[in-house]
UniProtKB/Swiss-Prot annotation:
Gene name as annotated: MYOB3
Protein name: Myosin-binding protein 3
Mode of membrane association: Single-pass membrane protein
Main location: membrane
Protein species of origin: Arabidopsis thaliana
Subcellular location(s) of the protein: Membrane
Domain topic, free-text comment: The GTD-binding domain is sufficient for myosin binding.
Record-linked Pfam families: Zein-binding
Ranges of biased composition (kind: Basic and acidic residues): 238-251, 596-605
Subunit structure: Interacts with myosin XI-K.
């Protein structure tokens, strides 16, 4: 109650999350205490076992006796045990003889201490004393005696029955018979109680029924009495399967034969008694069961049915056993209702044998009707089981078909996935090949780029060397040759510009037009320079003609008359041999020349310089014209596409090679001249 009060107060005063957190903490704390308790319990058990002490009961050390004064507030054993351990303890029994706890289902007669459990003894060993349970394979004999048959045994005069219990332990060693007499009303009450129980219980249905053998033994041969002995031993049990139709036919034939013998032949009383006894022997051999046997078989059948068919609500064997039990009780009740005081048959009191036969026939008919009803119920159950089996088989076949379809679909999807995987593998291989190819192309381009870089560096170094050489040449010249050096510088710059223009022509085609216009401008400038030089040359020739008209007038007239279409360059070239001869003469006899001739020599040298300049200008002009035509051709070829660019690249490479050759030649010439 304290815990409930605490829970109610906590739930009222706080919110739900706080309650959950508090109880979570309390559960963890409880688990910790349980762990400590189990740890100390384990330590106590190990301590006692290690030192050989007596084990302590786990339920004895309780402090509620000290803290709780009132007994109703103390904890009981039921509250301290869980359901699993209570069920485990409930399945055990205490043996007072040996002082042990053992399974109650497997106890011998000495350990169980209960007479009702002796009928459940079977094969195996006792769970308490390990004694074999097969030492007493069947229970005590139950002997049913009528008032007439039991005279030698001292039965009662009021027609009561005498029950004799024969113990197997005393059998064969001068045993004593313990007798107890019961009135007939006792058995009537038992029969009525059995009927009520049969009506209240529900039968369970299964497919086959085992037959149990019953044995009859004679107790006293002198009196000619026969007793019904029920033997439940597994070793003496005769398991024979006989159909009910044959039994009914045998019973009917025996009854009919016996009736005819009684009516026609009127045989002796002893023969009549023997026939009735045989008839009872045949009937009770297949139908008569004791109460303990039927209960045992019902329990066994229920367990077997639960194991084999847990979903079936009824069992054939249980119903069949109940029917047989009911028929056996009806036989006893019919015999008792006759009022002759006999349990088995009524003719032993001096009744009419025909009446007995009629009663037996009625009994047989009742049994046959009961058997027919039973067979009808069996057929219904069989048909129901057949229908359920057919439905189950149909369901199984449908499930198998669905399983096959699912397997086929799974295989199809698996094939599709495998094919897709193959396609993916092929695509990956192609991509790998492409990647390798691209890598190779990339490496090749990198190599070409390195080659081009090396060539560019080489060309730059050559251009620098050329510029250095030109600068050195310019510094070595005199002040008078400044103009020539400037022109040479311009020519070198123009050469460099040409190389750059050719490169730009390959890379940038839009610059070609501008370069052509620049060439035209340079051409015009060069033509102007040529005109100036020609004018100077003409003035110088006029002066010379005035001084020495005999030599140059003829040559000039021939040049002007015979070669009117020639340019000033051809005229200058024609004068070169004379100028060279004059230079040689001047070098050889420079010291011996008179002072009057120094002026003439200076004028001749100036003429030679002018002629050289004119020749160089004309050469540059021709080069510019050729370069202009080349650029025009390059522009026309560049318009053709990739082939034109390839051709331009090849031409540019050849031009560079030629330029390097020219530079090397000029450098060698300069070195030789300096030497």
């Amino acid at each position: 109650m304290a815990a409930n009060n605490f829970a109610t107060k906590l739930s009222r005063n706080t919110n739900r999350i706080t309650v959950i957190l508090v109880y979570a903490f309390l559960e963890w704390l409880l688990m910790f205490f349980i762990f400590l308790n189990s740890f100390f319990t384990y330590f106590i058990v190990k301590f006692a076992s290690f030192f050989g002490l007596k084990q302590v009961c786990l339920l004895c050390p309780k402090l509620d006796r000290i803290f709780e004064r009132k007994p109703e507030n103390r904890f009981t054993y039921k509250e301290l045990l869980c359901q699993n351990h209570i069920a485990e303890l409930a399945s055990l029994s205490f043996c007072r003889t040996h002082g042990k706890l053992s399974e109650s289902a497997n106890l011998c007669s000495d350990c169980s201490n209960r007479e009702e459990e002796q009928s459940n003894i079977g094969l195996g060993f006792c769970t308490c004393c390990q004694k074999s349970l097969a030492d007493k394979p069947y229970p005590n004999y139950l002997l049913l005696k009528s008032s007439i048959w039991g005279k030698t045994l001292g039965d009662r005069e009021d027609g009561g029955l005498i029950l004799e219990m024969i113990d197997d332990d005393k059998f064969g060693d001068g045993f004593e018979i313990d007798r107890e007499s019961y009135p007939l009303g006792f058995f009537r009450d038992k029969a009525e109680e059995g009927k009520k129980q049969d009506q209240q219980q529900n039968g369970e249905v299964i497919s086959d029924v085992e037959s149990y053998g019953l044995s009859l033994r004679e107790v006293s041969e002198e009196d000619g009495l026969r007793s019904i002995i029920s033997n439940n031993s597994p070793g003496n049990e005769a398991k024979s399967r006989v159909s009910e139709d044959e039994q009914r036919n045998d019973d009917t034939s025996n009854v009919a034969t016996y009736g005819e013998d009684q009516i026609s032949g009127r045989v002796e009383e002893k023969e009549e008694e023997t026939g009735v006894a045989d008839l009872l022997y045949d009937q009770f051999e297949s139908k008569n069961f004791t109460g303990s046997q039927i209960e045992e078989e019902e329990e066994d059948r229920e367990e077997t049915t639960k194991e084999l068919d847990p979903e079936t609500p009824t069992s054939v064997s249980t119903l069949f056993n109940k029917k047989l039990h009911f028929l056996a009780r009806n036989e006893y009740a019919a015999a008792e209702d006759a009022g002759d005081g006999n349990v088995l048959v009524s003719e032993m009191d001096g009744g009419d044998p025909l009446r007995t036969i009629e009663r037996l026939r009625e009994t047989v008919r009742a049994e046959q009707e009961a058997l027919r009803d039973l067979y009808a119920e069996l057929e219904e159950e069989r048909s129901a089981s057949a229908i359920s089996a057919n439905q189950t088989m149909a369901m199984i076949t449908r499930l198998q078909e669905e399983k096959a379809k699912v397997q086929m679909e799974a295989l199809q999807y698996q094939r599709m996935m495998e094919e897709q995987a193959e396609y993916d593998q092929e695509a990956l291989q192609l991509l790998n090949h492409l990647m390798v190819k691209r890598e190779k192309e990339k490496e090749q381009l990198q190599r070409e780029l390195e080659v081009y870089r090396a060539k560019v560096l080489e060309y730059e170094s050559k251009a620098k060397n050329k510029i250095i050489v030109v600068e050195n040449d310019c510094e070595a010249d005199d002040d008078d040759k400044e103009e020539e050096n400037r022109e040479e510088d311009n020519s070198s710059e123009m050469d460099v510009d040409l190389e750059k223009i050719t490169l730009d022509c390959v890379q940038h085609m839009s610059m070609l037009g501008e370069s052509l216009s620049e060439f035209e401008e340079e051409r015009l400038v060069i033509l102007d320079q040529l005109k100036v030089l020609e004018d100077r040359l003409v003035t110088m020739q006029d002066k010379e003609s005035a001084e020495d008209p005999g030599e140059f007038s003829n040559s000039y007239e021939e040049a002007s008359n015979g070669h009117g279409g020639l340019t000033m360059a051809s005229m200058a070239k024609s004068l070169l041999p004379l100028l060279d001869a004059a230079e040689n003469e001047s070098e050889d006899g420079s010291q011996g020349l008179p002072e009057s001739d120094e002026k003439n020599f200076g004028s001749d040298s100036e003429k030679l310089e002018i002629i050289k300049q004119v020749d160089s200008v004309y050469e540059r002009l021709q080069e510019l014209e050729t370069d202009g035509e080349f650029l025009k051709n390059c522009m026309s070829s560049a318009k053709k596409g990739d082939k034109g660019t390839d051709i331009l690249k090849d031409i540019l490479q050849h031009l560079r090679d030629l330029r390097t050759i020219e530079l090397t030649n000029t450098i060698e010439n300069q070195t030789t001249q300096e030497e």
